[in-house]
Swiss-Prot record:
The lineage of its organism: Eukaryota, Metazoa, Chordata, Craniata, Vertebrata. This is Striatin-interacting protein 1. GO terms for molecular function: protein kinase binding; protein-macromolecule adaptor activity; small GTPase binding. SMART domains: DUF3402, N1221. Residues 18-35 have a biased composition (Pro residues). The keyword Ubl conjugation does not apply. The gene is Strip1.
Amino acid sequence: MEPAAAGPGPLIVNNKQPQPPPPPPPATAQPPPGAPRAAGGLLPGGKAREFNRNQRKDSEGYSESPDLEFEYADTDKWAAELAELYSYTEGPEFLMNRKCFEEDFRIHVSDKKWTELDTNQHRTHAMRLLDGLEVTAREKRLKVARAILYVAQGTFGECSSEAEVQFWMRYNIFLLLEVGTFNALVELLNMEIDNSAACSSAVRKPAISLADSTDLRVLLNIMYLIVETVHQDCDGDKAEWRTMRQTFRAELGSPLYNNEPFAIMLFGMVTKFCSGHAPHFPMKKVLLLLWKTVLCTLGGFEELQSMKAEKRTLLGLPPLPEDSIKVIRNMRAASPPASASDLIEQQQKRGRREHKALIKQDNLDAFNERDPYKADDSREEEEENDDDSSLEGEAFPLERDEVMPPPLQHPQTDRLTCPKGLPWAPKVREKDIEMFLESSRSKFIGYTLGSDTNTVVGLPRPIHESIKTLKQHKYTSIAEVQAQMEEEYLRSPLSGGEEEVEQVPAETLYQGLLPSLPQYMIALLKILLAAAPTSKAKTDSINILADVLPEEMPTTVLQSMKLGVDVNRHKEVIVKAISAVLLLLLKHFKLNHIYQFEYMAQHLVFANCIPLILKFFNQNIMSYITAKNSISVLDYPHCVVNELPELTAESLEAGDNNQFCWRNLFSCINLLRILNKLTKWKHSRTMMLVVFKSAPILKRALKVKQAMMQLYVLKLLKVQTKYLGRQWRKSNMKTMSAIYQKVRHRLNDDWAYGNDLDARPWDFQAEECALRANIERFNARRYDRTHSNPDFLPVDNCLQSVLGQRVDLPEDFQMNYDLWLEREVFSKPISWEELLQ
């Protein structure tokens, strides 16, 4: 499902006869024109099949899969984040950077190494390099930029270990920041973005390669290293470094660059790339820099949690019932392995299943579990009878958590022991209490009292107890308070006073994004679609491989295998960056103001984000999470410190020893969280999950034995269980039990039954249009000053102020100014005494 290319328009689905979207092409991704053939494309048939098999191991025997020791965080380890910046094709450029630095360095310092100089000498040379960026000759400027990049990379030629490289890298980057390198690079980047000659040359080229983006890649590399390193807080940092970090974060989020935050410039690069005007832009580096810029300026998930607690205190709301980050970290997803008797029983059931007669059932009860998006892996047998009995012989990861045997011994950590009982405190909204009271009053008394939640006269004692329990667990969200305040501002614009909008980084960023936010969302989703492993390349799809393909295509089997790994890794990093950017923006906007979040979320929905994420998960997700698309000996900084061994097919296939790929699991969790954000409390969007038949796709994702990922999958299943029919619920009791155990409860939510279906007709357009009207009113009131009602605008009564205003006069008036003076001023008598009184 491709993101909408034109302006936003609601996705209209017929309520009576839901039609799934047309199935996209098979999930075997083909590179765009000019791209290399797939990994192993030059291999003999058997070898290619074996290589591909090692790349994506089949996860059908998932009962043997171990628990994934994965801890979710804002980013991966620093070394891993640095390594993912460079593609393996860029390897030879490390030595080129070193050569450019040493040629210039030897002119000024002949007898010492960089690591032997003192701080003043370092600063002097850094400023000298900075001056070199101002030359007009492109080649000279590029050489100086490469020399600066070598300094930012830790002057690795003088280091003997990876730790030493990282030490000097951190020192050098704070030095470069101190002399003002980042601002100079922003100006150069702006110049390169507007370089029309490079853009028109790239548009005309049939196949774009690494060479077309050299200048941009060097600049983006330095900027990424600065942002990523300064953002990392280390215990041994000097006091001045900590001060510089705070100043840098503030500047990065302020509208200092063309009167807009730096992130807006990067968003502009993304849209320019997607429009086809700049196909040479190195999109992976742009997206990584965009992600780290947003993370650095707005803050990560733990910072967000503390900001949320502060805001609740400010609004006079009670504290959060628990710290969700800690609760999720303490959740377990392990399960006992399948016993031999279970396996025999499963085989017998499969044998019996073949002789079952087909039973005609109601549409949703039968709920055909075949996907609208058919992937290549062999899942027909699994989907023919999608009930939990088909998983009996497998180690279903959510079954009987409390009787789980102890996991393998690991080093002691500071994790809290998980308390007995349910992990989450239940929540109740004010609206839920009102609905409960209304139904109770109409049932027992025969009349209603509107939104009165205190009067319980005439209601039986058990109802009193129920209301007391509901009120004990009442939870008022920040979003509800913000929506109520917005209603007040609109209801009484004069008496309500002027709203004080705090210029926090999220507010500044939203103001910058607001004019073109729909285009930014469409562009990000287009790139996500092109990078998804289930996508098939089309002639009109964008080429995201411009900064990974070499000038000359591989000629040997080994080069082809290396490039295949590089291309897959490149796509995975892009998915990781986009998913992280979208999630961070959604969470920060939701905290800053609910209608900022709703504006972004609605444009994601209009651009088909929901089916796109479902399409992403319609693959062998266990294979995606355990994919080994990395060559550890070629990762930075390992490749610049150690002598490179001779690459062989075996060393390429070996990958690392991790049981999962951190970036892929991180991406999957982010995408599930985005899907949760988009559908939460939105009936029409929940029905989209049902219409797109997401249940079987999500159920397969439960095979990944990681607690956080399972939690968000179960949340998505919970919101749609009431619409899947009784038969589905009956045959998926283990999933229902898992939802009960893992997901937060709403005390009067009838999620497991579906008794209120008749009262909730599905009208996508009406719901989205009502929400859109609220969003537009909010944006117009707060940001659209030009179209405000003139009666409500303040009036300037000061004579000096009015006379001091500059008025633009039309040209014809200026030419005939003498005539106007004669007719309107000199020819009319003026009573100066009256005028001056």
